[in-house]
Amino acid sequence: MEWENHTILVEFFLKGLSGHPRLELLFFVLIFIMYVVILLGNGTLILISILDPHLHTPMYFFLGNLSFLDICYTTTSIPSTLVSFLSERKTISLSGCAVQMFLGLAMGTTECVLLGMMAFDRYVAICNPLRYPIIMSKDAYVPMAAGSWIIGAVNSAVQSVFVVQLPFCRNNIINHFTCEILAVMKLACADISDNEFIMLVATTLFILTPLLLIIVSYTLIIVSIFKISSSEGRSKASSTCSAHLTVVIIFYGTILFMYMKPKSKETLNSDDLDATDKIISMFYGVMTPMMNPLIYSLRNKDVKEAVKHLLNRRFFSK
């Protein structure tokens, strides 16, 4: 009987929007368009940060990493989600679910840390402009970006390994679009208090600590901006931070609402799962990567000029 109750699962069923075929078709079209915008927008930012010598600075190096990160993050989930919208059998193998869970968590953690690094870069640029070339030299900002990726990979590997080792019962229905780690963890028929503790520690270290760094950095930046006597100087200083601050508010506002809101095991796996959670999850997974290049391009003259230069060069080369 114990063996029957602890069946070895080989696949999971992603419920998503099952039972709403019209909504699935609508979401397929919308998400496909958004994914194309994500690839084009973030791909353009990566190209200009590499090809334009004027953008070979720490700020745009971090921005290029952020754009590449957004492409990787969405590619781990959107294609499979689109396929599931058109497929009657919405299943994913255990190994495929583990890979998707690892990549999604790794990219999310990396983005949190990277946004903290970018805030520190803006702090040094505005509050210590004379020492900026020394503090944010290539020997500093390249390891900072690499460290963000390493932290994301290590954190995700540790959490994913602990989750896949859990015993799963017959219930293999994930009431989500993707293999989100918390939704998968709640399917286990074992005590998950250790996993929850590890997740709490990871959340504190890799989500809240970068957020604290961002808050401290921007508090000092605001104080420095108010000390600038000329209105032109204040405007120039604030414009260099407005795009990053907007991205931070959208990213952290969404992620904190998703993961800080208490959820019970019954709520995560019930048929009447709060639709707001799914909408916010979709917003976090698609809208944020799509908006990042738009925000940076609309609020940054250097990016606009670099895009124009790239387009003109391609046009005249033909």
Curated annotation (Swiss-Prot):
PROSITE patterns (alphabetical): G_PROTEIN_RECEP_F1_1, G_PROTEIN_RECEP_F1_2
The entry's keywords: Cell membrane, Disulfide bond, G-protein coupled receptor, Glycoprotein, Membrane, Olfaction, Receptor, Sensory transduction, Transducer, Transmembrane, Transmembrane helix
Main location group: membrane
GO BP annotations, alphabetical order: detection of chemical stimulus involved in sensory perception of smell
Glycosylation: residue positions: N5
Molecular-function GO terms, alphabetical: G protein-coupled receptor activity; olfactory receptor activity
Topology relative to the membrane: Multi-pass membrane protein
Domain of life, source organism: Eukaryota
Metal-binding as UniProt keyword: no
Protein name from the UniProt record: Olfactory receptor 13C2
Organism: Homo sapiens (Human)
